[in-house]
């Protein structure tokens, strides 16, 4: 019983809360982008036009951006679409900043508490690795997007060449599902005790 309490209170519960919070901030950012430019951004869940076989996000939503190069709609991936929205005067930079802040907390929690994963939940450890890799790329993108400090300007230093990002660095959606399942399993066990 004590081990389940520890797993829930130190890993699964906090992770679920952090992921849920990050997801809510992400959705508010989606709404802000839609209100800024509805011909470029849309949430298919709200339009009721989701096609069969489309992989929705863990909360059942599907946010898209119109890709002008491909002349078609595609799934919006924060890590891939960063430069087209961050620092572009769309009023969403604060949402991105907050998601990165929450990501720091998630990353630290994973690094400190991954040993509390339930033994039969090994797939979550793989998802943790994927998340940590994703977050390192996101963090680097965020750092490079910040204006140069006075010290950097005075020294003439630059933040380096733009980071090349691939789809593999996108947020691993499976992690939210696995954390939610684990949290629910532990809550059920604790309720019976």
What are these regions (language model features)?
Residues 1-193:
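Conserved non-transmembrane functional hotspots
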